[in-house]
Structure formats: structure tokens, C-alpha cells
Amino acid sequence: ELLCEATKLSGDSTYWKVATSHADATLKNHFREDGSCYHVIDYNPNTGEVLHKHTAQGYAHESVWARGQAWAIYGFTVCYRYTKDKKYLDQAVRTLNMMLRHPNMPNDLVPYWDLNAPNIPNEPRDVSTAACIASALYEMDKYLPENGYHALADRIMTSLSSPAYLAELGKNGCWLLMHSVGSIPHGAEIDVPLNYADYYFLEALNRR
């Protein structure tokens, strides 16, 4: 988004080319057949060959790390906004559908931090994932109004606005949302408020 805006503001197409090249490489190499994505791809800096595929902040390299999926949905929706290239929106839809159909997706649509984590339902939820998806859905609804994405986003926002996730005024360190997860494998930011969870929540409210 920043690179595309840089081209719009400066008239220099270099930023646009970098953005679309990165998006296309991600589209080609990050996704599995079911629409889920890896977190990190290591490339040979000289040849561009894929060396390793990782999920650094998820349960396992082949697991469905929830926030990574949310960023894929959100990010490729943004790519479509700027380029109007349908392949980006199609990927956002594929990843969204994978999440919605996953047997471990909770009924309130606030995902576990990793949908393949071993102790579900006794695993932490990640509110930042839900907020990010909700914000993306409100934008996706503009492009695919027949898919009911606005209503789906409303369902997520209703969950996030409930006492289970929305903090009481003046509590939770003055953050809005509780129960986000940074990186369980690294023992960092587990079941805490996160600034980007609040960001996506406020953005979703604004888009609504």
C-alpha cells in the first residue's frame, strides 16, 4: 500500500513495480493448494530460487498460523484496490474461504492463534486476526457485494464488541481489545492487547 501510494504521489513507477513484483512472488510461492499460506519464504538472493518455507510464529511450518492468513486476505485485497487485477482478489477469497471452512474455526469467528495448534479448544484466541479479517471484509464487500461479506464482518465485529474481547473503559492498559497473540513459539505477547489489533478494529469500524 505504501509503495503504491508512493508512485501515485511521486509519479515514479519504480515503487509500483517493486510492489507488484513482491505481490506476484508472494502469490506464486507462499500459498498451499488449500489456500493457506506460509509465514516466511527464504530466497537465494542471487537466483531467486526458493530455499525454505517457514511458519515462524505458528505452531508448525505446515500449520495454519491465523494472523498470517488474515494478512494475506487483507494484503491481497489492497493489491486489488490499486491494480484491479482479479488474481489478487481471487487469492484473498481463497484464503478467506479456507479459514471459514476450517474445522477449528470457532463459531464466534475469533480464531485460535493457529488453527492447527494441538490443544484446541484450550488454545489462546488471537483477536488481532479477527479484527484484520473484519476490516478486509468490509473492503471486499465493495468488490463482491453478492458474497455477503458485510454481514460476515458485522458478525466478527459483534463478537469483538462483546465483553469476552472488548475491555472495560479505562482498563486493559487503555487498549480497546483483549486477548491477542504475538508469537507463542517465541514466548512473546501471549494473551495481551496489541496495538495493531486496535488499529484494525478501529479501521473496521470506520469502514463499516
Predicted segment positions?
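Glycan-recognition and catalytic cores of secretory/periplasmic carbohydrate-active enzymes
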Residues: E1-R208
